[in-house]
Amino acid sequence: MTPDERSVLIRQYADGPAVLRAALSRVPDQAMKWRPAPGKWSVHEIVCHCADSELNGAMRLRYLAVEPLPRIVAYDQDAWAREFDYHGLDPNLALSVLDAARRWTVPVLERMGEEQWRREGTHTERGRYTVEDWLRTFAEHVATHARQIDRTVAAWKARPSGETAKGSLVALGHRRTGE
């Protein structure tokens, strides 16, 4: 990855909270906790996931950039959503966490030297995992969820009138693991 390519991805990473807020501005209040299908996240849960993922990601970057061959541990994202009862948490606080973690991490990325960019560790699901892999993943992560929010709102608007949330996280039959 060239320094110019990195700069583009760092800017995309920095812009993530604004992208998420733009998607959230299109969500009716009544749609925030609606799930498009059993086992799928609501917009509210997506926002909380982004905060938890960002906290994990910020630490992963630091381990990768500094520690010798760190082990990067995946986590069961659905279990976090269920066990931490994301619907019971404040999505505005989650947005603040996301924003603060990114504002704290962007200068780290901007100041990293070439040696740090070449560092790597081992991800428990993906195997070899480099700082550049991390940047590619997290530069796109929030934008991916912003598109998911748009799809969820479209499904909410297209639902038969009077339909309530479909399913719960308790009924999840699959394991969605960590970026």
Residue ranges with predicted function:
Residues M1-D4, V27, W41, L89, ...:
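Short coil/turn linker and secondary-structure boundary residues
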Residues A31-A79, R103-V106, E114, R118-E179:
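Short, contiguous alpha-helical
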Residues P3-P17, K40-V47, P91-L95, E132-L135:
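Amphipathic, non-membrane alpha-helical segments in soluble helical-bundle scaffolds
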